[in-house]
């Protein structure tokens, strides 16, 4: 039986670190420029994004061992998530309640289509729209700690349907890739329509 995982308090720890930096600045013991630079980093959106992804992975990774082993594995997984997003927006964690009305968004893409899985539509007035945080063009990286990168479309659908109470999504915003993918799909649909029209015309001429 797996040991209970003690919840993290990283947000509290960051706040304490900022308070300590403010005290050190008042004391004049260290150069204020360096302390202010470190304080800006700790209070930045980037640091918040790292903390959110780390906490999400820490809570959901299936790892046995000491707290140190778990922390090390979570750190590696967090670095991997941000490395994979290099050149794109950084990963974000979006948590939505799971209700009878659904989650309020559509996804497209998957391994069978040789593309990542994307949020193709946020339904106006739906759960995702009301809670905010999720955008059309977000690439879906994981669902409740389970990676969907390189997975089939149906795998993501199953994970979203199986979620109970709430669902935690790790996403990153890359709208250009979604636009390219939609343009590719539209070309494929147009080619199929032309082929069907050609077949229909050929049958008519034979008649």
Curated annotation (Swiss-Prot):
Motif stretch (Kinase interacting site): 1-13
Subcellular location: Cell membrane; Basolateral cell membrane; Cell junction; Postsynaptic density membrane
Membrane topology: Peripheral membrane protein
Record SUPFAM superfamilies: L27 domain (SSF101288), PDZ domain-like (SSF50156)
Domain PDZ, residue spans: 93-175
Domain L27 as annotated: residue spans: 10-65
Signal peptide coordinates: none
GO biological process: exocytosis; neurotransmitter secretion; protein transport
Region described as Disordered: 187-207
Superkingdom of the source species: Eukaryota
Cellular component per GO, a single term: transport vesicle membrane
GO molecular function: protein domain specific binding
Record Pfam families: L27, PDZ
Polar residues composition-biased segments: 198-207
UniProt entry keywords in alphabetical sequence: Cell junction, Cell membrane, Exocytosis, Membrane, Postsynaptic cell membrane, Protein transport, Synapse, Tight junction, Transport
Tissue: Expressed in the kidney; predominantly in the vasa recta.
Family statement drawn from the similarity comment of this UniProt entry: Belongs to the lin-7 family.
Function summary: Plays a role in establishing and maintaining the asymmetric distribution of channels and receptors at the plasma membrane of polarized cells. Forms membrane-associated multiprotein complexes that may regulate delivery and recycling of proteins to the correct membrane domains. The tripartite complex composed of LIN7 (LIN7A, LIN7B or LIN7C), CASK and APBA1 associates with the motor protein KIF17 to transport vesicles containing N-methyl-D-aspartate (NMDA) receptor subunit NR2B along microtubules.
Domain notes: The kinase interacting site is required for proper delivery of ERBB2 to the basolateral membrane.
Subunit structure: Forms a complex with CASK and CASKIN1. Component of the brain-specific heterotrimeric complex (LIN-10-LIN-2-LIN-7 complex) composed of at least APBA1, CASK, and LIN7, which associates with the motor protein KIF17 to transport vesicles along microtubules. Forms a heterotrimeric complex composed of MMP5, LIN7B and PATJ; the N-terminal L27 domain of PALS1 interacts with the L27 domain of PATJ and the C-terminal L27 domain of PALS1 interacts with the L27 domain of LIN7B. Forms a heterotrimeric complex with DLG1 and CASK via their L27 domains.
PANTHER family: PROTEIN LIN-7 HOMOLOG (PTHR14063)
Name of the protein: Protein lin-7 homolog B
Lineage: Eukaryota, Metazoa, Chordata, Craniata, Vertebrata
Gene name per UniProt: Lin7b
């Amino acid at each position: 039986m797996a040991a209970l995982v003690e919840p993290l308090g990283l947000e509290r720890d960051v706040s304490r670190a900022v308070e300590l930096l403010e005290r050190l600045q008042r004391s004049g013991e260290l150069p204020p420029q360096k302390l202010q630079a470190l304080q800006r980093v700790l209070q930045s959106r980037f640091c918040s994004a790292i903390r959110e992804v780390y906490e999400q992975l820490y809570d959901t990774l299936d790892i046995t061992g000491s707290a140190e082993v778990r922390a090390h594995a979570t750190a590696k997984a967090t670095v991997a998530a941000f490395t994979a997003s290099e050149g794109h927006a950084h990963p974000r964690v979006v948590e939505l309640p799971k209700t009878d009305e659904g989650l309020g968004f559509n996804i497209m893409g998957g391994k069978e289509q040789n593309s990542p899985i994307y949020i193709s539509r946020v339904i106006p007035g739906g759960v995702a729209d009301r809670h905010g945080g999720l955008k059309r063009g977000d690439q879906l990286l994981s669902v409740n700690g389970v990676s969907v990168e390189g997975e089939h479309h149906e795998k993501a659908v199953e994970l979203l349907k199986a979620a109970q109470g709430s669902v935690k999504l790790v996403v990153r915003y890359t709208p250009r890739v979604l636009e390219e993918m939609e343009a590719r799909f539209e070309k494929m649909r147009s080619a199929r329509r032309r082929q069907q029209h050609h077949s229909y015309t050929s049958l008519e001429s034979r008649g």
